[in-house]
Amino acid sequence: MPTINQLVRHGRKVIKEKSKSPALQGHPQKRGVCVRVSTMTPKKPNSALRKIARVRLSNGIEVTAYIPGIGHNLQEHSVVLVRGGRVKDLPGIRYKIIRGALDTDGVENRKQSRSKYGTKRPKK
């Protein structure tokens, strides 16, 4: 516990908040190029093959990003848009690829939550 005099001389130290998506460098999204597209198994109680991509961002940083939704058209050299947001059951994955932007297609036959998966409105 500092004295009043010590506080007058030095003041309080401001605790800086650590970014949860440092590779984006404060930007909401970043463009990148897929280096590798593969699958990964989730943490303990879950079982699946989650689709992931290794992406080299436009600032030169390489990150691993999750590909949401059922099915995708990504391959090496695809240009993608990456946003922040972790996947709870995949350790080390702190970014997601935005569906329906740049080279990424939207999810086929999606009826609900379409805006999150880049799907156009279905014809009646």
Swiss-Prot record:
Residues found modified as 3-methylthioaspartic acid: D89
Feature: compositional bias, Basic residues: 112-124
GO molecular function: rRNA binding; structural constituent of ribosome; tRNA binding
Classification via InterPro entries: NA-bd_OB-fold (IPR012340), Ribosomal_uS12 (IPR006032), Ribosomal_uS12_bac (IPR005679)
Region (Disordered): 104-124
PANTHER family: 30S RIBOSOMAL PROTEIN S12 FAMILY MEMBER
Quaternary data: Part of the 30S ribosomal subunit. Contacts proteins S8 and S17. May interact with IF1 in the 30S initiation complex.
Protein family according to the UniProt entry: Belongs to the universal ribosomal protein uS12 family.
Name of the featured protein: Small ribosomal subunit protein uS12
Organism: Thermosipho melanesiensis (strain DSM 12029 / CIP 104789 / BI429)
Gene label: rpsL
